[in-house]
Amino acid sequence: MTAGANASNPSIARSASNAASHVSALDVPPQTSRGSLIVLEGVDRSGKSTQCKKLVDYLNSTGRPASLMRFPDRTTTIGTMINSYLSNSTEIDDGCIHLLFSANRWEKKKEMEQRLSEGTTLIVDRYAFSGVAFTAAKGVQGMDRAWCMGCDVGLLAPDAVLFLSLSAEEQERRGDFGEERYEKREFQAKVREAFDGLKEEYKGRWETVDAGGTMDEVFEDLKGRVDAIVQGHKGPLGRLWSM
């Protein structure tokens, strides 16, 4: 799969043009007892990893089975390659690294389906939305949002995306900012813009959370939202970004 070929593929372009149609039901009957698939997204250093862990601990403590998943999953062979790139140890072509990020999500798809079908709620630290936003923000010819989305067609669609919003000033004040490849102010601004576009396309399942407060304040906000999602009615699992 090449960037040029997919960028000109009209079916992918159509798939990326209307988020209201991005989620389609899997060919399985509704499972009222399935777990919820909740994704936390946001710019770097917005506190996603900390909040994901706190949410999993909270759900389990209240008798609702929950597990944490992170993308990239740096424990796999593919994840090890991604980690080397992010830590600036190796250089990888922009198209290739995007495909590796996507492959890292694909290799966990069956595990995610299994856990959800068993009634476990998954709290996911980054997902396909980050993959699209970070690559699209690079502005590389042939790697527009439609191409980026095409690589993840068929992955599980989350019940909700909770986006942790943080100002550039607050982001840079947080510890360790700048250690990884993408942690540059100008680039993070472009990532924000890319996320804004995804937010508009994923209306109804995307909630913006102010991450500028204390850790406990943000957690209380997230906890209420997650309670509503987990307790709410869930239809059959869907897939990204199909018509």
Located regions from the model:
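Conserved lysine of the Walker
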Residues: K48
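A glycine- and Lys/Arg-enriched "phosphate-lid" helix/loop adjacent to the NTP-binding pocket
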Residues: R126-A194
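Short glycine-/polar-rich loops that comprise or flank the Walker A/P-loop
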Residues: R64, L156-A160, Y202-R205
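NTP-dependent small-molecule kinase module
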Residues: T2-Q31, K54-V56, E169-M243
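Hydrophobic positions on the alpha1 helix immediately C-terminal to the Walker A/P-loop
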Residues: Q51
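Walker A (P-loop) phosphate-binding loop of P-loop NTPases
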Residues: R45
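Hydrophobic anchor at the beta1->P-loop junction of P-loop NTPases
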Residues: L40
